Amino acid sequence: TMTSTITRIAPTIIRVSDKTNWTFIEVKTSDGVLGVGEATLYGQEEAMRALAGKFEGDLKGKPLSAIEDLAEATSASTDQAQRAVISALEQASWDIRGKQEGKPVHELLGGTKNTQIPIYANINRRTVDRSLAGFEASGRAAVDAGFNLLKIAPFDGLHPDIGRDGDAL
């Protein structure tokens, strides 16, 4: 209901592979409704766990709308972990609202706009052989499985401080 308050914020970190952890943030309200949001940001799990604890302290006992207030107040933040956790809190709040109102979230956000959406295969994590041939084999496997859009990140060993020509900036 609109008068329910936040009673718990808890992160769950799931080890999916040696390269991947998924992070979910759960928000529970005083009327027992549980909402879930996703905050995956590899390598930042402990920072996100700490932020979830901090935000639980800040938001516990407050109405769900306090999450929107937090998002607006921190919208200029460049802290990736903070942005990921706040995004997950917003997702969880929409999940809760949908459950409380008995409506799907997409309806709360304005309704169906498209009946079909394109999907892609992210072949980055599955590609153990990081050579060109390895990426090609992964790409072919995805195409053979019916995908016509692919996502990869073949940038192992490159860092943001390296310029386009390979020189340090």
Region annotations inferred by a language model:
Residues N21-T23, G53, I117:
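Residues at beta-strand starts and edge strands
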Residues A10-T12, V105, E136-A137:
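Glycine-rich, charged/polar anion/phosphate-binding loops
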Residues Q116-L169:
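Metal-dependent enolase-superfamily TIM-barrel catalytic cores that perform enediolate-based chemistry
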Residues E90-R130:
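Glycine-rich, aromatic-flanked loop segments that form ligand/cofactor-binding clefts
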Residues M2-V36, T40-L41:
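Structured beta-strand/loop patches that form or line metal/cofactor-binding pockets in enzymes
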Residues K28-E101:
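Metal- or metallocofactor-binding catalytic centers and their adjacent structured scaffolds
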Residues S4, S87, T115, A145:
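Structured loop/turn residues at beta-strand edges in well-structured enzyme cores
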Residues I13, A81-R83, R126-T127, A133:
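A generic structural signal for short
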